């Protein structure tokens, strides 16, 4: 059975973002694949060269260590970042813990910057 590439392209062009997301999830499940970027295989190092550096981490967890002196400002920022309710954000500010998990390096850095700007102590793992 030959694929009609143009027809498939037209169908996909008319699909909503939600429909495309569902299609992607169904294909991942059917084919047993993940969205992880493939890791390039490095060439063998030259004689005497050091081993290849470790893989760079792509997903980060943003951990709140301490709210600092401006706890109210930290709570407001936590609510804006996470969408948590007032009580949940207050508990997180008081006890510390994960703010967001499995985010990109750029997003993790932005969250850390926002929280540190209001006096919080934040760690990226």
Swiss-Prot record:
GO terms for cellular component: cytosolic large ribosomal subunit. GO terms for molecular function: mRNA binding; structural constituent of ribosome. GO terms for biological process: translation. Keywords: Phosphoprotein, Ribonucleoprotein, Ribosomal protein. Gene3D superfamilies: 3.30.1390.10, Single helix bin. The ion at m/z 13016 is probably phosphorylated; treatment with phosphatase in the presence of kinase inhibitors decreases it weight. This form is only detected on 70S ribosomes and not in isolated ribosomal stalk complexes. Pfam families: Ribosomal_L12, Ribosomal_L12_N. NCBIfam families: L12. Forms part of the ribosomal stalk which helps the ribosome interact with GTP-bound translation factors. Is thus essential for accurate translation. It extends beyond the surface of the 70S ribosome. The stalk is preferentially stabilized in 70S versus 50S crystals. Belongs to the bacterial ribosomal protein bL12 family. Homodimer. Part of the 50S ribosomal subunit; present in 6 copies per ribosome. Forms part of the ribosomal stalk which helps the ribosome interact with GTP-bound translation factors. Forms a heptameric L10(L12)2(L12)2(L12)2 complex, where L10 forms an elongated spine to which 3 L12 dimers bind in a sequential fashion. Contacts protein L11. This is Large ribosomal subunit protein bL12. The gene is rplL.
């Amino acid at each position: 059975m030959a694929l009609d590439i143009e027809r498939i392209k037209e169908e996909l062009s008319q699909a909503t973002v939600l429909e495309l997301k569902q299609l992607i999830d169904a294909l991942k499940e059917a084919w047993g694949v993940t969205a992880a970027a493939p890791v390039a295989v490095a060439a063998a190092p030259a004689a005497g060269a050091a081993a290849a550096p470790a893989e760079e981490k792509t997903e980060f967890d943003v951990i709140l260590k301490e709210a600092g002196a401006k706890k109210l400002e930290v709570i407001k920022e936590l609510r804006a970042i996470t969408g948590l309710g007032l009580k949940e954000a207050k508990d997180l500010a008081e006890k510390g813990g994960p703010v967001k998990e499995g985010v990109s390096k750029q997003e993790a850095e932005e969250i850390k910057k926002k929280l540190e700007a209001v006096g919080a102590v934040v760690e990226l793992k």
